[in-house]
Amino acid sequence: MKLVIAEKPSVALSIAKVLEANDKKDGYVEGNGYKVSWCVGHLIQMANPDAYDSRYAKWNMEDLPIFPKEYKYEVTKATKKQFSILKKLMNESSVDTIINACDAGREGEAIFRLVYTEATCKKKVKRLWISSMEDSAIKEGFSHLRDGSEYNSLFASAQARAIADWLVGMNISRLYSCLYQQNYSVGRVQTPTLAMIVKRGDEIAHFKKEKYYTVELLTDGFSLSSERIDDIERAKRLKNKVGNTIQVSDVTQKEKTTNPELPFDLTTLQRECNKFFGYSAKQTLDYAQSLYEKKFITYPRTDSRCLTEDMITSTVNNILGKNDFDTGRIKMVFNSKKVTDHHAIIPTISSLQEDLSKLPESEAKVYRLILNKLHASLGYPLKESLTKVVAEVEGFSFSCTGKVIIEEGFTKYLKAYKAKKSEELVLPSVSSGDILHLESSELREKYTAAPKHYTEDTLLKAMELAGTEMIDKAVEVERRGLGTPATRAGVIENLIYKGFVERDKKNLLATHKGINLITIVAEKFKSAETTAKWEMELSDIASGKESKEAFLRRIEKEIQSLVEQYRNSI
């Protein structure tokens, strides 16, 4: 008998259906030589400090730092019943093999391993690693089960991340709460993210707008604008020197080619859903996860934007169908070397036969965007003709740039998501030396623009790129930044939940509480560079290049140093 453990009931039932295990029991399904059960997210959590020593129930600076020799775990209260069911099933004599069917990623691996360890199970483990919940993908996955030990390094990385978060949260939060007599929460990823939001707010608050001027000339069907002029008297003199005509000094034409972007990873999907639909990062992740479990899209928690080369035939034949595509894009989109644990997010083949009206509108929007993005990624380039007309008066240049679309290329798939304003500006045919008759001239007063507050779109991009200036350019992009594609939405929501950040329409603003925290926290624990470096090291642990123990020792050393610094200053 084989026991299959999935991450959620809905996923377990989909797997059970494929395995023809149809006999429903309390907390599992049985049949055809399988028992299929499920976790309910994280059944096991790290214990709080008072589980190690009752004195830690009170927050005292004298007790810091807290570095357990062995970390304790406990079953969450809400999931005790399901854990008991899993423990009983795992230790039944009839079960000889456990199949880990939790989500194929770092957190999915951790969810299963912690249950397996807490249940004191010693049985053989196999790993189901799939990127789609389609029946065909599940069958294929079960025919190629991997040995569970292949993912030991992935679990070590998950453990290291959880322990690092615990160490920073339990020690640094207590340190500042004790020092300032206020309940502060410091997080390994959360606090550097908050620091970016606070810094942007500070830049906006202290921004001093600068006034400048331009002279605008309206001629036959278009207008020419001068360069920026800082002095109003100089701008007035220029306007007064302009007569009823102006001579064209230069006309340049060039063709601009824009290639399409690659299909979505989770971060780019979240960014575009925020930009186009106003969805939060968490909403997009929830909608995508639901679409995955309904077999409409492939695994969403991916950091890859390419597809594997063995997917070319099925994608071209079944998803692209009769739609025209650029064969020259094949090598860009289908590149196995650029795929990590999972390929880019695309629609499943079976979803193309489904009625989208059965989906909630929010999920249908996300699905259509994913489908259109895939079509666009394999589309032809956008080709535009750019014409720049320049005229001069008293050494000042006036110019206008026109744009005409020659071939719309991939943009035909993305028209629904673009601004409605005209993207073309057609200029009349003019040549160098031509005399243009002016209809009017106008002096315009303008101001330099302040930086914009972060939206979830721009914050996700900033989190993805944070700390990269400190990292060797040869390092893969997916190993940089604050958090991972799967965790960034939770970080943003947590900042809002804890009162450090608030939403103002699409903007994310730091609260007084958030600003106060960043004011007092040491640079090391609010630095994007530090956290990006730690994220790289976690990736190295997952690939077997770094040890969990060495990583955690370095973090303990940083915490010890900070605690002693404050203790000695009191």
Regions found by a protein language model. Give the residues of each.
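C-terminal or mid-to-C-terminal helical accessory/interaction module adjacent to the motor/catalytic core
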Residues: 71, 84, 93, 135-219, ...
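Metal- or metallocofactor-binding catalytic centers and their adjacent structured scaffolds
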Residues: 232-264, 270
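Basic, low-complexity terminal or inter-domain segments flanking catalytic cores
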Residues: 2-3, 90-96, 118, 173, ...
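Conserved short loop/turn motifs at secondary-structure junctions
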Residues: 1, 101-104, 181-183, 253-262, ...
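Structured, non-catalytic alpha/beta "coupling" segments that mediate domain-domain communication
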Residues: 25-56, 191-234, 375-426, 554-564
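Amphipathic alpha-helical transducer elements in NTP-driven molecular machines
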Residues: 9-16, 33-36, 40, 76-87, ...
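Intrinsically disordered, low-complexity regulatory segments
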Residues: 1-162, 166, 450
